[in-house]
């Protein structure tokens, strides 16, 4: 007490206002009365509540200011003998109260000072503080403590689920389950690699894990060392890895399904590399774990297609839920924090659970992409982050018409492409071809960009969805057009655009070019929509930004092409391009963005369907090569 008193005395020399004292005393008296009468029906109601409040305040103060409590209680003792009983020491100090109050006044002042500040509030409604003798647990602390505990609990849950689900496993899925259970995968889901899109809580988010720990399955690495490196890195058994890699999973897991093996656009309708409807589950998700996966999971390793095996439509995509599903954000890695919040630890986003996911959603878009917003800005600069770049451009154009200057490369490229597209549909075609070649080359050469694109695209998709939706589209459009007019960095843009397009898995980029080029307005719209995703990307972005707008612009573009949507689809330009581009880069951005933005799974589906051809073809060509290397699952 004295040490505290001294401390307080030293700390607080202000005389405690008499008014405050009076208020406190009166309040305490009232409380005391209440305590006496509380049992009686009379004062039980409000009096009781205030009493609790007071007690609460005191208790809280006790926890936080133990010495203060004692002072306080001493001060209050005369009036609150009962109260003091809680605080034994103070009980007998009632007589001393005045002395101590004065002697301790400074201390009291400290305490009472707080107390009175609190008290009026308390009188008004300290209720905010739950009555408790224990210190109030801070939510942050709880959360901080939670990740480790959560993980452990999660494992427990996981184990229980493991057995439960084992019992509940559908017959068709039992094989996989048993197989992996034997391996201690304990994935209650159909297959260890298949997690319910909608409930990511069922098991470790393998996609998230894989994205976090790519196992060397990144596009860049895939071409050369893919199988071996991945196998070496694979946490699980080699057999399983091989199954996924080589498509054995197709045999073992229905989820892995031929889609996993077939890199054919038909299976790719999901838009392997980038697109894929959220539920397409096509390999498109392999690359991005479905766009959802990339979006949701870590943008980092959007392509762990192998693991997902993009099993059919379930595998990857089911595994990687769209935004909400996975770590979803957290995982920058799984998009849905829902996915594996536990694993969110792997993905920065989900560290704390699904909200990481939210963050990830934010993060996904932003965090996953190094802060999408910034990244976009950066992306514009780093157009090399294809998706990011393109999208950035789109977004950025949306977000930063000014950034567009950064984007100028891209925007101009887009504009350029647009100009080309507008001016020269065939030029755009050439650009497309070039892009195709370039993109293919880049895609293969710079698979990572593609994958990055997938990731970023996914992220960007969301962003694009969000941003593109923005009125900035118009601004972007203007910016792009202006830039187009300015023609700044057009060369750079072409390269950037090509790279971006390439990164975008340029089927879409090509398409984008066409789509964009066909209709300058459409392209501009797309481009503007795309925000300087170069018209091609613009188409894609248009698709993303405005699945409908892109489609329309794209449609127009395709019409301009003299092709209908099918033509676009065939070309993978215009709508298909948007979709394809969206599927590819835009597609991922566009298609997914369309999904996310427009929430038009249908558009995506439609786009995917249409895109599948162009996107699937282009992407399959570009991404398919990688994927084929990956094998059905990866």
UniProtKB/Swiss-Prot annotation:
Annotated stretches, region: 4 X 10 AA tandem repeats of [TS]-[KE]-[GE]-A-T-K-[EG]-A-S-T: 540-580
Biological process, per Gene Ontology: poly(A)+ mRNA export from nucleus
Bias type Polar residues, positions: 494-505, 605-620
Residues glycosylated per entry: 42
Cellular component, GO annotation: extracellular region; nucleus
Chain positions of Sequence repeats: 540-549, 550-559, 560-569, 570-579
Low complexity: bias regions: 95-104, 567-591
Signal peptide (from-to): 1-34
Region Disordered: start-end pairs: 57-143, 347-634
InterPro entries to which the protein is assigned, alphabetical: EMP3/KAHRP_N (IPR040805), RNAPII_TF_IWS1 (IPR051037)
Biased composition (Basic and acidic residues): 354-375, 396-405, 423-444, 453-493, 509-520
Function: KAHRP might mimick human histidine-rich glycoproteins to anchor host thrombospondin or a parasite analog in a binding complex with the endothelial cell receptor.
Protein name: Knob-associated histidine-rich protein
Organism: Plasmodium falciparum (isolate FCR-3 / Gambia)
């Amino acid at each position: 007490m004295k040490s505290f008193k001294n401390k307080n005395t030293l700390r607080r020399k202000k005389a405690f206002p008499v008014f405050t004292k009076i208020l406190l005393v009166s309040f305490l008296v009232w409380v005391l009365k209440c305590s006496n009468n509380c049992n009686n029906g009379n004062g039980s109601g409000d009096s009781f509540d205030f009493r609790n409040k007071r007690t609460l305040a005191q208790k809280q103060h006790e926890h936080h200011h133990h010495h203060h409590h004692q002072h306080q209680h001493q001060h209050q003792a005369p009036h609150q003998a009962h109260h003091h009983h809680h605080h034994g020491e103070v009980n007998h100090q009632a007589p001393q109260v005045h002395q101590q109050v004065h002697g301790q006044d400074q201390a009291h002042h400290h305490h009472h000072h707080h107390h009175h500040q609190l008290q009026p509030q308390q009188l008004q409604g300290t209720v905010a503080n739950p009555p408790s003798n224990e210190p109030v647990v801070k939510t942050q602390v709880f959360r901080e403590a939670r990740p480790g505990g959560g993980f452990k609990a999660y494992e427990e849950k996981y184990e229980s689920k493991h057995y439960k689900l084992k019992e509940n496993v559908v017959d068709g899925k039992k094989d996989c389950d048993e197989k992996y259970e034997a391996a201690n995968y304990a994935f209650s889901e159909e297959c260890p690699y298949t997690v319910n899109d909608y409930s990511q809580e069922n098991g470790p988010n393998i996609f998230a894990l894989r994205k976090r720990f790519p196992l060397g399955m990144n596009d860049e690495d895939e071409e050369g060392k893919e199988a071996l490196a991945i196998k070496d890195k694979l946490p699980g058994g080699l057999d399983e890895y091989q199954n996924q890699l080589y498509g054995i999973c197709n045999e073992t897991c229905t989820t892995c399904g031929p889609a996993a093996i077939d890199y054919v656009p038909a299976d790719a309708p999901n838009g392997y590399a980038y697109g894929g409807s959220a539920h397409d589950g096509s390999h498109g998700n392999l690359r991005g774990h479905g766009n959802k996966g990339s979006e949701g999971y870590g943008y980092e390793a959007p392509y762990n297609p192998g693991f997902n095996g993009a099993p059919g439509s379930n595998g990857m995509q089911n595994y990687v839920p769209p935004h909400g599903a996975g770590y979803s954000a957290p995982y920058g890695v799984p998009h849905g924090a829902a996915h594996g919040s536990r694993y969110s630890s792997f993905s920065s986003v989900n560290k704390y659970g699904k909200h990481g996911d939210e963050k990830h959603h934010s993060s996904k878009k932003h965090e996953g992409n190094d802060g999408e917003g910034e990244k976009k800005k950066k992306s514009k600069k780093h157009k090399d982050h294809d998706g990011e770049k393109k999208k950035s451009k789109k977004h950025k154009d949306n977000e930063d018409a000014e950034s567009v200057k950064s984007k100028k490369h891209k925007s101009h490229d887009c504009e350029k492409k647009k100009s080309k597209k507008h001016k020269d549909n065939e030029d755009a075609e050439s650009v497309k071809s070039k892009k195709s070649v370039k993109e293919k080359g880049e895609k293969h050469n710079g698979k990572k960009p593609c994958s990055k694109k997938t990731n970023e695209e996914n992220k960007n998709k969301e962003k694009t969805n969000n941003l593109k939706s923005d009125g900035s589209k118009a601004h972007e459009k203007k910016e792009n057009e202006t830039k187009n007019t300015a023609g700044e960095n057009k060369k750079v843009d072409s390269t950037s655009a090509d790279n971006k397009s390439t990164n975008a898995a340029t089927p879409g980029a090509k398409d984008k070019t066409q789509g964009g080029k066909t209709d300058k307005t459409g392209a501009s719209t797309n481009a503007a929509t795309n925000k300087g995703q170069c018209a091609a990307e613009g188409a894609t972005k248009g698709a993303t930004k405005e699945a409908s707008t892109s489609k329309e612009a794209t449609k127009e573009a395709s019409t301009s092409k003299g092709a209908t949507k099918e033509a676009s689809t065939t070309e993978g330009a215009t709508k298909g391009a948007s979709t394809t581009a969206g599927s590819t880069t835009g597609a991922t951005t566009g298609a997914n963005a369309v999904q996310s933005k427009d929430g038009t799974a249908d558009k995506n589906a439609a786009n995917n369907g249409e895109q599948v051809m162009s996107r699937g073809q282009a992407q399959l060509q570009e991404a398919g090569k990688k994927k084929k290397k990956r094998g059905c699952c990866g």
